[in-house]
């Protein structure tokens, strides 16, 4: 019985390898999404410029910060770090929070622009976070579950409108992402 128990313990631990849910690294500059996205209601796209057009949402450059902070709160210690990086023409070395394995492919534009998925679906209550942390587990099972439960968003997409209408003729259930190939291995794995 102890051998079986040991095997189960090892197997259960393997399922958690690489899961970084709640990971909250210390950043080189204390940045509050609660202030920027919450209090000041700055849209995610303003700083994360690639979210609608790219695989990556992009981590903001010093220049993005300087659009506001060349004049706003320039006397604060954390803002001075931004000013120094700008003056020395050096990037801010942000620590990546949301990591997927190299064997996984994830495209922000496909999910946000085409799929209509809100940032909070994966990133959680970002507008309430003083310090960003990985809200979701971002495991394969977590992604697959989302693809099984999420209805295809056809808003503004004539092709998907036709798919939804055709699906409706043959099924009483709504068209889900899994129904249009959302569970095919090659969609997310190279």
Question: Where are the regions that the model predicts?
Answer:
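A generic structural signal for short, solvent-exposed coil/turn residues
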Residues: 2, 21-23, 36, 86, ...
């Amino acid at each position: 019985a102890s051998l079986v128990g040991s095997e189960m313990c090892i197997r259960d631990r393997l399922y958690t390898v690489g899961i970084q849910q709640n990971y909250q690294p210390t950043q080189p500059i204390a940045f509050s999404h609660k202030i920027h996205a919450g209090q000041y209601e700055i849209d995610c796209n303003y700083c994360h410029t690639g979210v609608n057009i790219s695989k990556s949402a992009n981590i903001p450059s010093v220049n993005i910060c300087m659009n506001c902070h060349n004049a706003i709160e320039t006397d604060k210690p954390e803002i001075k770090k931004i000013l120094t990086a700008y003056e020395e023409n050096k990037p801010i070395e942000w620590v990546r929070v949301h990591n997927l394995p190299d064997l996984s492919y994830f495209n922000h534009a496909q999910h946000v622009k085409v799929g209509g998925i809100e940032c909070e679906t994966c990133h959680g209550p970002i507008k309430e976070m003083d310090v960003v942390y990985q809200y979701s587990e971002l495991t394969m099972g977590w992604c697959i579950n989302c693809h099984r439960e999420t209805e295809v968003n056809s808003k503004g997409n004539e092709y998907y409108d036709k798919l939804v209408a055709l699906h409706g003729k043959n099924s009483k259930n709504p068209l889900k992402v899994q129904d249009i190939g959302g569970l095919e291995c090659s969609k997310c794995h190279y």
